[in-house]
Structure formats: structure tokens, C-alpha cells
């Protein structure tokens, strides 16, 4: 269920401060964050944000199509290796 419009987008304050600092200085270094729940806002466009997936930080380059989505959507937490093959199908 989407968030109410009257509440506005959720963004952790520590991440917002890092984004504002990077935009001011023009720094292209990835911003490391554990905040998967934060929403992508227009001021993040063009930045690389390293989102934690539980094991490592996955670099996510923010483009304009990503606005309104959450950071965690772009850093998968599970690796799918496929189902076991049928032994009968191999013969």
C-alpha cells in the first residue's frame, strides 16, 4: 500500500544530509547507506548510492525514472540459483 500523500516521502535525515553535502560539493563518490526504506527524491539524480543488501553495499546510480521508488528495490537481498534439475530429464 502506498504512503499517504499528506505525509510526504520518507527519507532518513542522515541520508538527506549526505545527499545535500554531495550535491553542494559536486562529489561523485558513492554515498554508503543502510537505509533501504528511504525514498528516492529528485535531488538524488546523478548520484551513486551504495545500498546495503545484508552482505555488501550495492552501487545504485540514480536516474529520473527511479524517483518515488525506495532504495531497497534496487539492491536485491536474495540470490536465486534455480531449482534442482530433474534426474529423469538428464537421461
UniProtKB/Swiss-Prot annotation:
Keywords: Ribonucleoprotein, Ribosomal protein, RNA-binding, rRNA-binding. InterPro entries: Ribosomal_uS19, Ribosomal_uS19_bac-type, Ribosomal_uS19_CS, Ribosomal_uS19_SF. GO terms for biological process: ribosomal small subunit assembly; translation. The keyword rRNA-binding applies. It holds the Pfam family Ribosomal_S19. It comes from the Bacteria. One of its GO terms (cellular component) is small ribosomal subunit. SUPFAM superfamilies: Ribosomal protein S19 (SSF54570). The keyword Disulfide bond does not apply. Belongs to the universal ribosomal protein uS19 family. Protein S19 forms a complex with S13 that binds strongly to the 16S ribosomal RNA. This is Small ribosomal subunit protein uS19. It comes from Haemophilus ducreyi (strain 35000HP / ATCC 700724).
